């Protein structure tokens, strides 16, 4: 026998009684029901091919008798068994007159209905029966394998020392260098009211820069944030002086919602130099060198009719060659070209460095140039003594002290008469009597010379010998795999001479601190150094902890640390219980006389409104 064909074009073969036309006419005349029986078809697999050895049909012979049911059933059973071909008879028995359907009684219908309901309930139970649906063999084997591995890894068997330690090596993916607009990003080197400052390096010129990053959302929340940024950009674009920070580039990325301002790089600020000293002050020569650079920068700004209005040590940056540069022009104001003086109307700046005409508010205007000179005088006072000329823990008391109290010279350092005279003139409460920048530059103390003015002294030595911060160190290392600054390089020349190159003296830290200058001699604190609250105390000679920078919008005015426990009573007796104007809640109320009606405790009007911002912290 031939195998069954799988051709898609095979036609199904119809087995009908009498394939011959003559035999068909004879049967049509003899049998009246033949037309109905001719409609009966045998549905056979369409892939079935004719077989010459079939017993039902013999080549060259006509059918001797009509095909009976027994003959067809036998052929179907035989061929299904031999060839695995499924064959079925469609409506073969549909018109069998011998099979008469018996009429179903009412009892049979009831029995059939009950049996159907029972089958439905049985199927629903099988769907929830777990025994009828066993877990596949593959899943059970996988579960056993996982349980075995977990038991071995979790060290449940303490006797077996093979699994006492789990070897775990996390996959660490090194972060690649971040490059935006041709600048490789480094670490953060500072923060401000409008954003943070990061170090970067120009990929084309290999020059270190500092980028100021400002977010759109933060600028919207700050009052006049966008206006101040636009003013700073317009002013810095026109500035070109060695004592004014230089603006390199400005670019904007709307997709990130950030504005970037690229400046020249500086290693730190004057405030950081003060914080590194245990005495919180500099020498007279170092202060003189910084003040000369400050006045030269202010003279240039005033010649361009620009008032900075926020001069303080935190806004004076120091370059690698110890050049002081004025920065942070966020509140600076461009004065009208047709004005004869430096009239300004917007009051901005740090409270401790603001002049009396700004904090009082009793003038319709103030001179911006004279306000900068007041701030320069406070800065000079802070550099030489480590203190502020007017300082109170509460903002209202601070303003009152600036406007009414006379100037007191510091007692922890010895000042010359020329320096005292200059401080007195710069801190004159009447701005009409206050000297201008040109008048200050011809003062005798300003014209005097110190070794620090010629690049000598402690600070210049520190700048030459200290570690150089480089926050792009990790990013630059990632560009060249296998080369690290800590590795010692051994080079052999053509003559066979081996030369060993020591590792580069770099650090990835961004903040100047005492650890950056090993072996450097700092100014030790003496009695009287530090804030006014600890003046004259025995413990003031000890190194002071890190303090916050002067007050700003992001860092409000903080109260100085309280006196020591041993001198608490003396300081209270000298200063008085109501110096700060805030009634202490821990003090017991005064004892009333016997028989007198109870009196309510008097409270200062400002104790609720102007409660110290930092006392609660």
From Swiss-Prot:
Active site: 310
PROSITE patterns membership: PROTEIN_KINASE_ATP, PROTEIN_KINASE_DOM, PROTEIN_KINASE_ST
Organism: Caenorhabditis elegans
Biased composition (Polar residues): 1-11
Signal peptide (from-to): none
Domain Protein kinase stretches: 183-446
Cofactor entry: Mg(2+); Mn(2+)
Tissue specificity of this protein: Expressed in the gonads, oocytes and early embryos (at protein level).
Catalytic activity, as annotated: L-seryl-[protein] + ATP = O-phospho-L-seryl-[protein] + ADP + H(+); L-threonyl-[protein] + ATP = O-phospho-L-threonyl-[protein] + ADP + H(+)
Keywords: ATP-binding, Cytoplasm, Developmental protein, Kinase, Magnesium, Manganese, Metal-binding, Nucleotide-binding, Serine/threonine-protein kinase, Stress response, Transferase
Annotated positions binding ATP: 189-197, 212
Name used for this protein in its record: Serine/threonine-protein kinase par-4
Keyword Oxidoreductase: no
PANTHER family listed in its UniProt record: MAP/MICROTUBULE AFFINITY-REGULATING KINASE, NON-SPECIFIC SERINE_THREONINE PROTEIN KINASE
Segments of this protein annotated with the region Disordered: 1-59, 523-617
Phenotype of null mutants: Maternal effect lethality. Blastomeres cleave synchronously until the fourth or fifth round, when synchrony breaks down. Cells also fail to segregate P granules, with the posteriormost blastomere tending to contain more P granules than other blastomeres. Terminal stage embryos fail to produce intestinal cells.
Predominant localisation class: cytoplasm
Lineage: Eukaryota, Metazoa, Ecdysozoa, Nematoda, Chromadorea
A GO term for molecular function: protein serine kinase activity
Entry GO CC: cell cortex; cytoplasm
Family, similarity comment: Belongs to the protein kinase superfamily. CAMK Ser/Thr protein kinase family. LKB1 subfamily.
Cellular localisation: Cytoplasm, Cell cortex
Subunit field text: Interacts with strd-1.
């Amino acid at each position: 026998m031939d195998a069954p064909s799988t051709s898609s074009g095979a036609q199904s073969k119809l087995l009908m009684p009498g394939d011959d036309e003559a035999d068909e006419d004879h049967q049509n005349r003899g049998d009246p029901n033949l037309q109905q029986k001719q409609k009966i078809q045998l549905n056979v697999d369409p892939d079935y091919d004719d077989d010459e050895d079939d017993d039902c049909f013999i080549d060259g012979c006509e059918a001797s008798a009509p095909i009976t049911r027994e003959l067809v059933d036998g052929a179907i059973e035989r061929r299904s068994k031999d060839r695995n071909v499924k064959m079925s008879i469609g409506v073969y028995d549909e018109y069998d007159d011998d099979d008469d359907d018996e009429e179903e009684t009412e009892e049979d219908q009831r029995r059939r209905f009950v049996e159907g309901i029972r089958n439905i309930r049985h199927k629903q139970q099988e769907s929830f029966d777990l025994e009828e649906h066993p877990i596949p063999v593959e899943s059970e084997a996988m579960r056993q394998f996982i349980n075995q591995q977990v038991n071995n890894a979790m060290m449940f068997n303490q006797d077996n020392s093979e699994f006492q330690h789990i070897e775990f090596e996390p996959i660490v993916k090194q972060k690649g260098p971040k490059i935006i607009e041709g600048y490789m990003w480094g670490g953060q080197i500072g923060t401000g009211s409008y954003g943070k400052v990061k170090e970067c390096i120009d990929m084309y010129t290999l020059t270190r820069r500092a980028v100021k990053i400002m977010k759109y959302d933060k600028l919207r929340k700050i009052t006049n944030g966008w206006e101040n940024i636009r003013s700073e950009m317009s002013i810095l674009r026109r500035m070109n002086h060695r004592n004014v920070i230089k603006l390199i580039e400005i670019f904007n990325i709307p997709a990130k919602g950030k504005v970037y301002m690229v400046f020249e790089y500086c290693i730190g600020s004057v405030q950081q130099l003060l914080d590194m000293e245990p005495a919180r002050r500099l020498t007279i020569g170092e202060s003189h060198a910084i003040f000369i650079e400050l006045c030269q920068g202010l003279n240039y700004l005033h010649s361009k009719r620009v008032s900075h209005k926020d001069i303080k040590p935190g806004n004076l940056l120091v370059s690698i060659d110890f050049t002081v540069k004025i920065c942070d022009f966020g509140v600076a104001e461009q004065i009208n070209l047709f004005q004869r003086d430096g009239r300004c109307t917007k009051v901005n700046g740090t409270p401790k460095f603001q002049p009396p005409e700004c904090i009082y508010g009793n003038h319709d205007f103030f001179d911006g140039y004279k306000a900068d000179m007041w701030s320069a005088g406070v800065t000079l006072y802070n550099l030489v003594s480590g203190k502020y000329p007017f300082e109170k823990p509460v903002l209202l008391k601070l303003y009152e002290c600036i406007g009414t109290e006379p100037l007191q010279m510091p007692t922890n350092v010895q000042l010359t008469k020329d320096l005292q005279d200059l401080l007195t003139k710069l801190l004159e409460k009447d701005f009409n009597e206050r000297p201008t920048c040109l008048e200050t530059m011809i003062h005798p103390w300003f014209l005097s010379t110190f070794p620090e003015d010629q690049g000598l002294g402690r600070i210049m030595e520190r700048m030459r010998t200290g570690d150089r911060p480089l926050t792009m160190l990790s990013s630059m290392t990632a560009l060249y795999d296998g080369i690290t600054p800590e590795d010692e390089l051994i080079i052999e020349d053509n003559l066979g001479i081996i030369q060993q190159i020591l590792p580069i003296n770099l650090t990835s830290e961004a903040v100047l601190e005492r650890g950056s200058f090993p072996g450097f001699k700092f100014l030790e604190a003496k009695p009287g150094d530090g804030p006014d609250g600890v003046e004259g105390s025995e413990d003031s000679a000890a190194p002071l902890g890190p303090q916050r920078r002067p007050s700003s919008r992001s860092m409000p005015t903080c109260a100085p640390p309280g006196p020591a426990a041993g001198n608490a009573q003396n300081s209270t007796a000298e200063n008085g219980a109501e110096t700060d104007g805030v009634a202490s809640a821990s003090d017991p109320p005064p004892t009333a006389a016997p028989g007198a009606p109870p009196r309510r405790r008097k409270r200062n009007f400002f104790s609720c409104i102007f409660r110290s911002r930092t006392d609660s912290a």
